[in-house]
């Protein structure tokens, strides 16, 4: 009986010491055209994880980064997100810089019920229970700037410019309607 109690106590002690790690997926381009912007975000995540672990982790559990390189290739972002969630079994992902990379990852994150923190401004008009959009949307950035030009600077005419890309196209569509609602025509 004594051996049984001792063995049970040892098993309980071992189980209480076995703390599960929290795997943090880092989904930023380390190569290709976006590497110049996204490598810094990867480095920042690794620094923050190291600092948090030095303070005892999160709720007593160690944070373990799992870094992948989607290589500035939008379809590869989806594949790497799937890899992080299924092969590496991460608990959360931090990543993407561009709207198109986020939109590539979104169906995978929703299908596998993952969690993504998206770090930069975005065009709005998208909502998912699986994504924390941490950057400003047009109603938090572009609209207040437009109001400033209208109210403080007295600007009466606007020309909406941007590259042929998701963020500027969508933001300009929102701004065009906003200006139209205020009775201001947008130049062609």
List the predicted regions and their residue ranges.
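Gram-negative bacterial Sec-dependent N-terminal signal peptides
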Residues: 1-19
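Immediate post-signal peptide segment of exported/extracytoplasmic ligand-binding proteins
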Residues: 18-26, 55-62, 150-156
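Short beta-strand segments enriched in small/hydrophobic residues
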Residues: 21-40, 96-97, 157-161
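Residue-level signal for short, function-critical loop segments
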Residues: 30, 71, 164
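Beta-alpha junction/loop-to-helix N-cap segments that form part of ligand/metal-binding clefts
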Residues: 36-43, 56-125
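Short, polar/charged alpha-helical segment
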Residues: 37-59, 174-181
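Generic structural signal for well-ordered alpha-helical scaffold segments
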Residues: 53, 82-85, 146-150
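Extracytoplasmic ligand/sensor domains, especially the bilobed periplasmic-binding protein
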Residues: 89-188
């Amino acid at each position: 009986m004594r051996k049984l109690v001792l063995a049970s106590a040892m098993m309980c002690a071992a189980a209480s010491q076995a703390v599960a790690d929290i795997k943090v997926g880092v989904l930023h381009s380390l190569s290709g055209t976006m590497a110049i912007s996204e490598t810094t975000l990867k480095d920042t995540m690794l620094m923050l994880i190291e600092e948090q672990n030095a303070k005892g982790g999160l709720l007593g559990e160690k944070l373990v980064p799992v870094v992948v390189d989607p290589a500035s290739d939008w379809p590869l972002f989806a594949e790497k997100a799937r890899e992080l969630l299924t092969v590496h079994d991460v608990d959360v992902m931090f990543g993407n810089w561009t709207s198109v990379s986020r939109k590539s990852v979104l169906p995978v994150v929703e299908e596998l019920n993952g969690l993504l923190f998206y770090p930069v401004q975005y065009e709005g008009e998208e909502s998912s229970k699986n994504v924390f959009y941490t950057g400003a949307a047009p109603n938090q950035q572009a609209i207040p700037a437009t109001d400033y030009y209208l109210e403080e600077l007295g600007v009466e005419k606007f020309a909406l410019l941007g590259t042929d890309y998701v963020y500027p196209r969508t933001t300009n569509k929102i701004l065009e309607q906003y200006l139209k609602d205020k009775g201001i025509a947008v130049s062609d």
